[in-house]
Amino acid sequence: FLYFATTGSGIGVLTADSPTGPWTDPLGKELISRSTPNCGNVAWLFDPAVYYDEETDEDYLFFGGGKNSNDGTGYDNPKTGRCVKLGKDMISIEGTPQTMETPYLFEDSSITKIGDTWYYSYCSNWNVPSGTSINGQLFNSADICYMTSKNPLGPWTKDQFAGMLFANTGSQKIDNGGNNHHSLVEFKGKYYVIYHSRQQEIRMNGGKDRNYRSTQINEAVFDQATGKITCKG
């Protein structure tokens, strides 16, 4: 199953019996569109993230981002993230997508489960005031932040905000900074953040930054006692 964005206005899904294809479109239309209940006012219908829960044999889809108004308000709680349970066929949804009150959501959903806790992570937008703290956790613009919940369908509000997972690549001096896309994944009992930066491109072009991105991966540190997870590039 391959879930993808259709130019920011919907989520499609392809299926294949092999990762090398051939891939086919089983629906002939988008899985999520502006006509999907509770999705008509999502600014950007893109950046899908899917997680299969082996314990319950259930799948969940997270998506969305952006800000609806252009009046300078709504950056702190744009309410443009959505989560929904997938059908057993994984090409349908069960119920209405739920609104996520994700602090300063910009884009870039990732979802995983550690123990009995769900970890939703995302890229914050470019309008986070300096010194912003939620639940005692500091973060900045275009950081990868995360929230936790015991239920994949929430409620997801600022009460579930858990902190910064991965600081912006600019503040880490990896490159000149920019928005990011990532995934938090588990492999053989360890956790990793897969993300993009322009570090390799800068090295190859004599220090020049032309905004070419390459994929990188670093191991994350998971504290079992506190449930905190952090990563440095």
Task: Tell me the role of every PLM-derived stretch.
Residues 1-233:
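Carbohydrate-active catalytic/glycan-binding domains of CAZyme proteins
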